[in-house]
Amino acid sequence: MKPSMLSKLDQLAERIVEINALLAREDATANLDQYRKLTREHAELEPVVAQFAAWKQAEEDIATAQELAADPDMKAFAEDELRAARERMESLEGELQRLLLPKDPNDHRNIFVEIRAGTGGDESALFAGDLLRMYTRYAERQRWQVEIVSESPSDLGGYKEVIARLVGEGAYSRLKFESGGHRVQRVPATEAQGRIHTSACTVAVMPEADALADIQINPADLRIDTFRASGAGGQHINKTDSAVRITHLPTGLVVECQDDRSQHRNKDRAMQVLAARLKDRQEREAQAKEASARKSLIGSGDRSDRIRTYNFPQGRVTDHRINLTLYKIDAIMDGDIDELVGALAAEHQAEQLAALGEDA
């Protein structure tokens, strides 16, 4: 093991002893925010320190086996023990390396999923609705909450644009690689000749910003307009100006929200989405600078990248970033995307490990 890695692990082992002492104090819960931070840090460090203890035990087992090997009667047994301990130590070192990879500070956050219809007109809008259902069904499988924050329905069903908020521990860590262009190939319901059409939607997954800590928004930078919410055919039409449009003047970002009958709640939701978009913009700019130095296929965050194709006639879904093709399109459209999510996370981890090797 590299000395730098060993030193880091020693520091973490010392830190968990400190945390245990702090949590054992009688006044540990006097400051609840501090208590939560310590328990979260403890939960993050515990698996690393446990693996490090197992690695040190394997190191001791090697030393013991080497001593035993000096005894002719014990040599065969000692060699078996030595081989097993070395294999165990090598495996644990690889696992420790993975555990020490830098964590994304946004991984635990709730998210906003923004889906926009692109090329393909009505068919693209219908596919936007299908993607929303896919993410909603996935969220339900995770026992997350889903709420529609803003929607712009199309005439034939589906959405020109829709924003959903997904609330659940680790939501961003699971879906952050869904940002990008999603292409669909299928025969539209309106197609009389049975020809396959190609349409596309853009998905943006944004971590929910901490209003106080992450993004400072100057009220002077905002233009807030109120207007009457537009009702769908024959449904309730709001007679008050409850819909809200917020324009962030320095960036030109515009957020509309009209799904609630309360202007106050619509404004709060619009501000949440604006904060998430500003945070997302900042982080993508930072990623772009980093990507100029090191090309990353996964998590480049470029919304113009076509990341996935859904081919209905062939029943397949292909993720172009990792060349993964799955022939279970019906299950995937019903929210069974664990295999895709897991493969993307594994590839990202492999990229991080490769980068660690380059920097070493």
Curated annotation (Swiss-Prot):
GO terms for molecular function: translation release factor activity, codon specific. It comes from the Bacteria. Residues 283-293 have a biased composition (Basic and acidic residues). InterPro entries: PCRF, Pep_chain_release_fac_I, Pep_chain_release_fac_I_sf, Prokaryotic/Mito_RF, RF-1. The modification N5-methylglutamine is found at residue 235. Methylated by PrmC. Methylation increases the termination efficiency of RF1. Keywords: Cytoplasm, Methylation, Protein biosynthesis. Residues 283-305 are annotated as: Disordered. It is found in: Cytoplasm. PROSITE patterns: RF_PROK_I. One of its GO terms (cellular component) is cytoplasm. Peptide chain release factor 1 directs the termination of translation in response to the peptide chain termination codons UAG and UAA. Belongs to the prokaryotic/mitochondrial release factor family. This is Peptide chain release factor 1. The lineage of its organism: Bacteria, Pseudomonadati, Pseudomonadota, Betaproteobacteria, Burkholderiales.
